[in-house]
Curated annotation (Swiss-Prot):
Pfam families: CDC24 (PF06395), PH_10 (PF15411), RhoGEF (PF00621). This is Cell division control protein 24. Residues 1-14 have a biased composition (Polar residues). Residues 278-454 form the DH domain. The keyword Transmembrane does not apply. Present with 1010 molecules/cell in log phase SD medium.
Length: 854
């Protein structure tokens, strides 16, 4: 009798159960979401049930025994490889350099010699790798379970069935029991070709005598694949054949009842403590929720396949919505299999910790989920509601909100693991089990922390895009040079805890290299502004810290007058810093490119208030980060000219602590980099000196080792001191050493000459490269300007000076830049920029300004 059955193109465990009718497929989504999941939905119990049903065939018993033995060996080898991997990771973390062959791994039994030999089973060879070689995590995945099995478990039923089917002959025996009138040849052999020939005969027999088509059948490759999805295809066909002969094979339900009775007899309830009972309850909850999670992933996989088959969405868009879904399902099925096995043994014999140790590398599969989750949700909101679905197309998920809930499942599950492991640890009474659970807790916390960090980074990326459009004038800074955005919040800032000093609220953004302060733009400017006092300066402003550019050049910030503000002592950003410079918003060409490339960014922030850029504090010059009792951080900073402190007051202590730990880590990392740089410089200098000395006078070096050591120590200390002085001098204006640079062409102005400049004037030292001269060198000349002049007056004076010098034979001036105190040339293109330059000169008691014309 031919069995007419049809399998879904997307393989899942639920396909092993009776197929739903057409009306049941279109049930509301909440029924799919809330559908109860039992042990019959678990691959572990499905395989155990099939194995039990196959045992009724006496001809299969020797093949089942052989499959059991090969699965046991694979489990031992997996245990050995995992122990090697963990041992070598420990050696690497401790900085050791010993051969890993010295390790003594903890295995489930003593059959290491069997596992480390060359084996040939059912035509498949397993060759042990070099013990000293570090195995990849993919190479440690030899069975369909993760980690190390409990000592009372030799193998899992899933791996055993996989090894059974790879022998080929058992499939032919199954076929002959169902269709005895069309018997297939049964050849027991360890020759791989013979095994594949038997599998091929089985597939042809199913096509011819059971009316299977190619889509409903599996391939020879599926039988030998190390994949749960491909194994499920084989299980579907095997179970269909068994269900076609109820007189030979007992039903699934009856078999399950027999198995439950055997388990109850094997694990008769004993007198146990309350702690033990609580532990067992937590394990049951762990397994039940994991079954539900795997089932939800399979629902998503079916929905993904339906979308692909309907041509409503591209494969690229599908990957954005369901990244690594197939790999995640395969991993989580194996994870669940291991949980099911551990749940069958006593808590003292469980290896939950080993499960997490093996799985921690595979949890990285979820990185695309955490990174692209927000993008997927946005895509659903903007795209799926536009798609028209025919009445004939009935999706297993037909509600956008419920689909979003399914997409959140992976991240939610990963964040749930630490809570479950923590509960197990609290109820654990075995010392060995406790140690492994502690390791599992650390791993699960790191996983959840990594997921949250990825989501935070993704969200911060969107915040930076919005910030770019919200700021009215970036005053010459380039946001791409700030590093990654770490935190942002609305924070109150002051210089003391005194209630007499007013606090001012700013939007503060913490980047890797800089802290930026913003205030919201209002229609009426407030008359009062925040003043951050300095300890060693009479100026009522906050000096910015230092940050080095790619060449190690220092940068020091200063005050800048607030846009459209006439007389306020506001905190302002420097318009300099090569490592944190942004093209000036006054540059028309830059503005045009920015506007064209970021129109979407402005749309993102259309409903949010615009921001004024008010101040910056460089991470490089932060000294101390001290949490205060009133939800505040006391931040001290120091430069070569001045030092100071300010308070950031947050809304709650948790936010303060996050900022505090982040800032302290940034300072710590920066100091480590500086130490490594100094150490590298010292080592290079010492090595060079020693090598030179050895080449010049090898005899002296050999005969006077004390002198050599003394010189080496001196050189090292001198190099360290020199590096330290260089770091301290980072706040000074840098000097260009290139012969063609502007700085090398101009002469320093003496103090007498500087004092001769009137207080109301500023001396411009102008460098101008006139292209009409067909020369690459710059011409240098000076111009005395008045402080009361506006920007237009400056342009007229400069043009007049150049015209008189070159008899009107000049190229048009397209851009003007001035040199700030950091040594960087910043655009001078408006009255505001001119005011900033004058403030810089006044703050540094300078009367001359270097200018470049373009």
């Amino acid at each position: 009798m031919a069995i007419q059955t049809r399998f879904a193109s997307g393989t899942s465990l639920s396909d092993l159960k009776p197929k739903p009718s057409a009306t049941s497929i279109s049930i509301p989504m909440q029924n799919v979401m809330n559908k109860p999941v039992t042990e019959q939905d678990s691959l572990f119990h499905i395989c155990a049930n099939i194995r039990k049903r196959l045992e009724v065939l006496p001809q299969l018993k020797p093949f089942l025994q052989l499959a059991y033995q090969s699965s046991e060996v694979l489990s031992e080898r997996q245990s050995l490889l995992l122990s090697q991997k963990q041992h070598q990771e420990l050696l690497k973390s401790n900085g050791a350099n010993r051969d890993s062959s010295d390790l003594a791994p903890t295995l489930r039994s003593s059959s290491i010699s069997t596992a480390t030999s060359l084996m040939s089973m059912e035509g498949i060879s397993y060759t042990n790798s070099n013990p000293s070689a570090t195995p990849n995590m993919e190479d440690t995945l030899l069975t369909f379970s993760m980690g190390i099995l409990p000592i009372t478990m030799d193998c899992d039923p899933v791996t055993q069935l996989s090894q059974l089917f790879q022998q080929g002959a058992p499939l032919c025996i199954l076929f002959n029991s169902v269709k005895p009138q069309f018997k297939l040849p049964v050849i027991a052999s360890d020759d791989l070709k013979v095994c594949k020939k038997s599998i091929y005969d089985f597939i042809l027999g199913c096509k011819k005598h059971f009316a299977f088509n190619d889509e409903e059948l599996f391939t020879i490759s599926d039988v030998f694949a190390n994949s749960t999805s491909q194994l499920v295809k084989v299980l579907e066909v095997v179970e269909t054949l068994m269900n076609s002969s109820p007189t030979i094979f007992p039903s699934k339900s009856k078999t399950q009842q027999i198995m439950n009775a055997e388990n109850q007899h094997r694990h008769q309830p004993q007198q146990s403590s309350k702690k033990h009972n609580e532990y067992v309850k937590i394990i049951k909850e762990f397994v039940a929720t994991e079954r539900k999670y795997v089932h939800d992933l399979e629902i998503l996989d079916k929905y993904r396949q339906q979308l692909l088959d309907s041509n409503l969405i591209t494969s690229e868009e599908l990957y954005m919505l369901f990244p690594n879904l197939g790999d995640a399902i395969d991993f989580q099925r194996r994870f669940l299999i291991s949980l099911e096995i551990n749940a069958l043994v006593e808590p003292s014999k469980q290896r939950i910790g080993a499960l997490f140790m093996h799985s921690k590398h595979f949890f990285k599969l979820y990185e695309p989920w955490s990174i692209g989750q927000n993008a997927a949700i946005e895509f659903l909101s903007s795209t799926l509601h536009k798609m028209r679905v025919d009445e004939s197309q009935r999706f297993i998920i037909n509600n956008k909100l419920e689909l979003q809930s399914f997409l959140y499942k992976p991240v939610q599950r990963l964040c749930r693991y630490p809570l479950l492991v923590k509960e197990l640890l609290a109820e654990s009474s075995d010392d060995n089990n406790t140690k492994e659970l502690e390791a599992a807790l650390d791993i699960s916390k790191n996983i959840a922390r990594s997921i949250n960090e990825n989501q935070r980074r993704t969200e911060n990326h969107q915040v930076v895009k919005k910030l770019y459009g919200r700021v009215v004038n970036w005053k010459g800074y380039r946001i791409s040079k700030f590093g990654e955005l770490l935190y942002f919040d609305k924070v109150f800032i002051s210089t003391t805890n005194s209630s007499s000093e007013p606090e001012r609220e700013f939007e503060v953004y913490l980047f890797e290299k800089i802290i930026i302060l913003f205030s919201e733009v209002v229609t009426k400017k407030s008359a009062s502004s925040l003043i951050l006092k300095k300890k060693s300066s009479t100026s009522a402003s906050i000096s910015a810290s230092n940050i080095t550019d790619n060449n190690g050049s220092p940068h020091h910030s200063y005050h800048k007058r607030h846009s459209n503000s006439s007389s306020s002592n506001n905190i302002h950003l420097s318009s300099s810093s090569a490592a944190a410079i942004i093209h000036s918003s006054t540059n028309s060409s830059d503005n045009n490119s920015n506007n064209s490339s970021s129109s979407s960014l402005f749309k993102l922030s259309a409903n949010e208030p615009k921001l004024d850029l008010r101040g910056r504090i460089m991470i490089m010059n932060l000294n101390q980060i001290i949490p205060q009792n009133n939800r505040s951080l006391n931040i001290t900073w120091e430069s070569i000219k001045e030092q100071g402190n300010f308070l950031l007051k947050f809304k709650n202590e948790e936010t303060r602590d996050n900022w505090s730990s982040c800032l302290q880590q940034l300072i710590h990392d920066l100091k480590n980099e500086q130490f490594k740089a100094r150490h590298h410089s010292s080592t290079s200098t010492t090595s060079s000196t020693a090598k030179s000395s050895s080449m010049m006078s090898p005899t002296t070096t050999m005969n006077t080792p004390n002198h050599h050591n003394s010189r080496q120590t001196h050189d090292s200390m001198a190099s360290f001191s020199s590096s330290h002085m260089k770091r301290v001098s980072d706040v000074l204006p840098k000097r260009r050493t290139t012969s063609s640079s502007f700085e090398s062409e101009i002469k320093s102005i003496s103090e007498n000459f500087k004092n001769s400049i009137p207080e109301s004037s500023i001396l411009f030292r102008i460098s101008y490269n006139n292209n009409s001269n067909n020369t690459s060198s710059s011409e240098i000349f000076t111009l005395l300007v008045e402080k009361v002049w506006n920007f237009d007056d400056l342009i007229m004076a400069i043009n007049s000076k150049i015209s008189n010098t070159h008899n009107n034979n000049i190229s048009p001036i397209t851009k003007i830049k001035y040199q700030d105190e950091d040594g960087d040339f910043v655009v001078l293109g408006s009255d505001e920029d001119w005011n900033v330059a004058k403030e810089m000169l006044a703050e540094n008691n300078e009367k001359f300004l270097n200018i470049r014309l373009y």
